[in-house]
């Protein structure tokens, strides 16, 4: 199937991640010349399927890699664990997908080392009962190294002595900070000397590349990682990721001006999920949560952890739209709701002081104590996994989508009804 996009586009998560961004990017990628990642790292898990139904779980490689005509770009805003990236590249090659010559990584991108993963675990242990619930992929510590200006960039790997000294400094800083820190820095230096020659063909000035592509009329698709409600500035801080998955991270992470994008697609599940700790107003428990978790197979691509489950939260979705300015939405996993007798949408919050609001609070304590005001809609009790057109959609399923449009003020252009590439209804 093909999408309806004819302009440079950004695909962004509007909830807490795992919305299904990778599938839409995979579908749209066939219409684009460049598919780019702009932030995050291997904490992002994007699952896509080819036309034969073969499954690919990607973490660093952009989801557009299955489009043989697209160049995939890993931008400067991404933190890159090179061994993990090559594991993905090798797995793709074994499956018949060759990334060589079609993928480039920014020379400005910061490297994530195993020491960052070690620090991540030690930091979580320190927090004890106040754990963030990270993926322990080292993302936060890698961005911390970048922010404190002692990080190592991919381009540094070209100078063996400079690279080795920078890594030794990182290790010494970590050893001084954490009593239990154990890391063989010299072995890591040797390991990366071997990696250096292999990564060299992938290293590029991606800022120049994407801007040159734009000047030459090539279409660019940006694949966001994580999601707005995990954004370092706009998410449920401190229960957030360490980058900016919201709109600002695109320009910062690629070096491409905001005005060069016309389309901003927000991806949202027809219900919600969250992995890790943090406030989650519409969270469900008991039989309904268990049923949705099993029907939607809600287990993390990166961690395998069971995801928390909740009803669609329109307060959060409208907040994400306010920040990102979505031109349209992709509502995913609508098929998962097919067995439900009735559905609920959170439309407002009752605050602890008794007032009702449709604004998303910044204060975590407030968020943890709101009462959600729900609107109830009838279910459709019909399997929609094989529906491929809007006209064939059950009336109550249409009503659910149309109500989402009314409450958000944004067109729901793409409607996911299953995991496969073709399981997407494009609303006329």
Curated annotation (Swiss-Prot):
InterPro entries the record matches: Adenylosuccin_syn_GTP-bd, Adenylosuccin_syn_Lys_AS, Adenylosuccinate_synth_dom1, Adenylosuccinate_synth_dom2, Adenylosuccinate_synth_dom3, Adenylosuccinate_synthetase, P-loop_NTPase
Catalytic activities: IMP + L-aspartate + GTP = N(6)-(1,2-dicarboxyethyl)-AMP + GDP + phosphate + 2 H(+)
Active site residues per record: 18, 46
Chief localization: plastid
UniProt keyword RNA-binding present: no
Binding positions (IMP): 18-21, 43-46, 135, 149, 226, 241, 305
Cofactor binding, note field: Binds 1 Mg(2+) ion per subunit.
Cofactor list: Mg(2+)
Binding residues for GTP: 17-23, 45-47, 307, 333-335, 416-418
Pathway: Purine metabolism; AMP biosynthesis via de novo pathway; AMP from IMP: step 1/2
Residues involved in substrate binding: 301-307
Gene Ontology CC: one annotated term: chloroplast
Positions of transmembrane segments: none
Keywords, alphabetical: Chloroplast, GTP-binding, Ligase, Magnesium, Metal-binding, Nucleotide-binding, Plastid, Purine biosynthesis
Localization terms from the record: Plastid, Chloroplast
Any one Pfam family match given in the protein's UniProt record, by short name: Adenylsucc_synt
The enzyme's E.C. designation: 6.3.4.4
Function statement: Plays an important role in the de novo pathway and in the salvage pathway of purine nucleotide biosynthesis. Catalyzes the first committed step in the biosynthesis of AMP from IMP.
Entry's family note: Belongs to the adenylosuccinate synthetase family.
Cross-referenced HAMAP family: Adenylosucc_synth
Miscellaneous comment as given in the Swiss-Prot or TrEMBL entry: This protein may be expected to contain an N-terminal transit peptide but none has been predicted.
Assembly and binders: Homodimer.
Record's protein name: Adenylosuccinate synthetase, chloroplastic
Species: Ostreococcus lucimarinus (strain CCE9901)
């Amino acid at each position: 199937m093909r999408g309806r996009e004819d302009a440079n586009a950004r695909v962004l998560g509007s909830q807490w991640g795992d919305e299904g961004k990778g599938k839409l990017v995979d579908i749209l990628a066939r219409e684009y010349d460049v598919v780019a990642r702009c932030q995050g790292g291997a904490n992002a898990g994007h699952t896509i399927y080819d036309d034969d139904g073969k499954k690919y779980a990607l973490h660093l490689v952009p989801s557009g890699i299955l489009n043989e005509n697209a160049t995939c770009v890993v931008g400067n805003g991404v933190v890159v664990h090179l061994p993990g990236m090559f594991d993905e590249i090798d797995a793709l090659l074994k499956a018949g997908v060759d990334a060589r010559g079609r993928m480039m990584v920014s020379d400005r991108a910061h490297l994530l080392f195993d020491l960052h993963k070690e620090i991540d675990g030690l930091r979580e242990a320190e927090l004890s009962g106040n754990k963030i619930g990270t993926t322990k992929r080292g993302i936060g510590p890698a961005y911390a190294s970048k922010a404190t200006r002692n990080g190592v960039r991919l381009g540094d790997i070209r100078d063996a002595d400079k690279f080795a000294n920078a890594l030794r400094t990182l290790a010494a800083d970590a050893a001084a900070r954490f009593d239990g820190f154990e890391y063989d820095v010299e072995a890591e230096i040797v390991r990366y000397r071997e990696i250096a020659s292999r990564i060299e063909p992938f290293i590029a000035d991606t800022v120049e590349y994407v801007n040159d592509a734009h000047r030459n009329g090539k279409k660019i698709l940006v694949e966001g990682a994580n999601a707005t409600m995990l954004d370092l500035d706009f998410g449920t801080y401190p229960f957030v990721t360490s980058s900016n998955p919201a709109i600002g991270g695109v320009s910062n992470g690629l070096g491409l001006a905001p005005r060069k994008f016309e389309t901003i697609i927000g991806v949202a599940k027809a219900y919600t999920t969250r992995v890790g700790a943090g406030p989650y107003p519409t969270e469900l428990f008991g039989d309904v949560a268990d049923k949705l978790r099993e029907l939607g197979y809600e287990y993390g691509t990166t961690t395998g952890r069971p995801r928390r489950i909740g009803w669609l939260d329109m307060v959060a979705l409208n907040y994400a739209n306010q920040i990102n300015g979505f031109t349209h939405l992709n509502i995913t996993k609508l098929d998962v709701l097919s067995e439900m007798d009735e559905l609920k949408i959170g439309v407002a919050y009752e605050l602890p002081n008794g007032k009702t609001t449709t604004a998303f609070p910044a204060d975590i304590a407030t968020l943890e104590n709101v009462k959600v005001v729900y609107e109830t809609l009838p279910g459709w009790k019909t399997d929609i996994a094989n529906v491929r057109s809007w006209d064939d959609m059950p009336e109550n399923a249409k009503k659910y989508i149309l109500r989402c449009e009314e409450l958000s003020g944004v067109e729901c252009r793409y409607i996911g009804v299953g995991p496969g590439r073709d399981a997407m209804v494009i609303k006329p």
